[in-house]
Amino acid sequence: MAAVTYELIKTCKQTGARLGKVHTPHGSFDTPVFMPVGTLATVKGMSPEELKEIDARIILSNTYHCYLRPGQDIVKQAGGLHGFMNWDRPILTDSGGFQVFSLSGLRKITEEGVTFRSHLDGSKHVFTPESVMDIENDLGADIIMAFDECAPYPAEYDYVKKSMERTTRWAKRCKEAHTNTEKQSLFGIIQGGMYKELRIESANQLKELDFPGYAIGGLSVGEPAEIMYEVLDYTAPLMPADKPRYLMGVGTPDYLIEGAIRGIDMFDCVLPTRIGRNGTVLTSNGRVIIRDAKYSRDFSKLDPECDCYVCRNYSRAYIRHLIKCGELLGLRLTTWHNLYFLINLMKQVRQAIMDDKLASFRDEFYLKYGYTK
């Protein structure tokens, strides 16, 4: 039996969105779910205990970054990421593919793998499907991702086709190299850029490899929202209904809701932590740039409808003061609130699916948030 399994609980009659539960060796989590990103074995500014307080059920960490610092051997010696960072709930690690391919001029792609230079010190390294499986095995996450090539946007058809075909061959090599199947589940990643024919081909080829879960990669890389939704419209239905469906690197409120409507179960993004550190907060009435002068005497809470620790205890004026002064507490408070906002949003999405009202919820949320469909 696979280490990670999916249980479908309900399908929304209004939209077709899925309410489910993913079971892992470190516990279960309800879906659709947003996963906070802990790139270097930490969600920036948040302790594991604080993540539990905001009800984060699963977090993501990054293979590329943990391989470079502190190194897979140190993490393995600590008992994997769970022991190293004192987190006893599920963890997902990406394969590092996106980071390696983002290095652009610092890397070279061959059929064997990718040769790249560290962004830290320029040292030379090689990632192959086999070496990435070895690293992810040592990191010890419950869900590990196959090593894939993420094509840029825009990209020519011929380039994307070759890239997608290589990703499929690498996925097969990853599956052959992954032996720790009782403790970890390996997910395949559907690629193909913005080309329908290639997405369909990728999905069908990966389904033949029978992974315990599937992800859609190569989206939210600069394409317009309507193109991303179009790709989801024809790709998500091709993914097995009895396995988790993961949309990689997506985390704005509208993307989360639209992804759920299209049958996606799992999402991750650095957005809430990154914009939080820059002084932007997510609220039920849209984004608030808290460093703006107009909030200097605003003693109301960040979001009038939020009951998180930050909103219960601190004002906009105080948080603006902290951010303007470069105080670490300010960055922690905005990060805390933003993560809570998205985790709570997904709770509302799950309830709306249960009530068969997700489309209605979307319309009400968009109206208040300031989105247009």
UniProtKB/Swiss-Prot annotation:
<keyword id="KW-0479">Metal-binding</keyword>
<dbReference type="Pfam" id="PF01702">
    <property type="entry name" value="TGT"/>
</dbReference>
<protein>
    <recommendedName>
        <fullName>Queuine tRNA-ribosyltransferase</fullName>
        <ecNumber>2.4.2.29</ecNumber>
    </recommendedName>
</protein>
<feature type="binding site">
    <location>
        <position position="337"/>
    </location>
    <ligand>
        <name>Zn(2+)</name>
    </ligand>
</feature>
<keyword id="KW-0808">Transferase</keyword>
<feature type="binding site">
    <location>
        <position position="306"/>
    </location>
    <ligand>
        <name>Zn(2+)</name>
    </ligand>
</feature>
<dbReference type="GO" id="GO:0002099">
    <property type="term" value="P:tRNA wobble guanine modification"/>
</dbReference>
<comment type="pathway">
    <text>tRNA modification; tRNA-queuosine biosynthesis.</text>
</comment>
<feature type="binding site">
    <location>
        <position position="191"/>
    </location>
    <ligand>
        <name>substrate</name>
    </ligand>
</feature>
<feature type="active site" description="Nucleophile">
    <location>
        <position position="268"/>
    </location>
</feature>
<keyword id="KW-0819">tRNA processing</keyword>
<keyword id="KW-0671">Queuosine biosynthesis</keyword>
<comment type="subunit">
    <text>Homodimer. Within each dimer, one monomer is responsible for RNA recognition and catalysis, while the other monomer binds to the replacement base PreQ1.</text>
</comment>
<dbReference type="InterPro" id="IPR002616">
    <property type="entry name" value="tRNA_ribo_trans-like"/>
</dbReference>
<feature type="binding site">
    <location>
        <begin position="94"/>
        <end position="98"/>
    </location>
    <ligand>
        <name>substrate</name>
    </ligand>
</feature>
<comment type="similarity">
    <text>Belongs to the queuine tRNA-ribosyltransferase family.</text>
</comment>
<feature type="binding site">
    <location>
        <position position="308"/>
    </location>
    <ligand>
        <name>Zn(2+)</name>
    </ligand>
</feature>
<dbReference type="GO" id="GO:0046872">
    <property type="term" value="F:metal ion binding"/>
</dbReference>
<dbReference type="GO" id="GO:0101030">
    <property type="term" value="P:tRNA-guanine transglycosylation"/>
</dbReference>
<dbReference type="GO" id="GO:0008616">
    <property type="term" value="P:queuosine biosynthetic process"/>
</dbReference>
<feature type="region of interest" description="RNA binding; important for wobble base 34 recognition">
    <location>
        <begin position="273"/>
        <end position="277"/>
    </location>
</feature>
<comment type="function">
    <text>Catalyzes the base-exchange of a guanine (G) residue with the queuine precursor 7-aminomethyl-7-deazaguanine (PreQ1) at position 34 (anticodon wobble position) in tRNAs with GU(N) anticodons (tRNA-Asp, -Asn, -His and -Tyr). Catalysis occurs through a double-displacement mechanism. The nucleophile active site attacks the C1' of nucleotide 34 to detach the guanine base from the RNA, forming a covalent enzyme-RNA intermediate. The proton acceptor active site deprotonates the incoming PreQ1, allowing a nucleophilic attack on the C1' of the ribose to form the product.</text>
</comment>
<dbReference type="InterPro" id="IPR004803">
    <property type="entry name" value="TGT"/>
</dbReference>
<feature type="binding site">
    <location>
        <position position="148"/>
    </location>
    <ligand>
        <name>substrate</name>
    </ligand>
</feature>
<dbReference type="GO" id="GO:0005829">
    <property type="term" value="C:cytosol"/>
</dbReference>
<feature type="binding site">
    <location>
        <position position="311"/>
    </location>
    <ligand>
        <name>Zn(2+)</name>
    </ligand>
</feature>
<dbReference type="GO" id="GO:0008479">
    <property type="term" value="F:tRNA-guanosine(34) queuine transglycosylase activity"/>
</dbReference>
<dbReference type="InterPro" id="IPR050076">
    <property type="entry name" value="ArchSynthase1/Queuine_TRR"/>
</dbReference>
<dbReference type="InterPro" id="IPR036511">
    <property type="entry name" value="TGT-like_sf"/>
</dbReference>
<keyword id="KW-0862">Zinc</keyword>
<keyword id="KW-0328">Glycosyltransferase</keyword>
<feature type="active site" description="Proton acceptor">
    <location>
        <position position="94"/>
    </location>
</feature>
<feature type="region of interest" description="RNA binding">
    <location>
        <begin position="249"/>
        <end position="255"/>
    </location>
</feature>
<feature type="binding site">
    <location>
        <position position="218"/>
    </location>
    <ligand>
        <name>substrate</name>
    </ligand>
</feature>
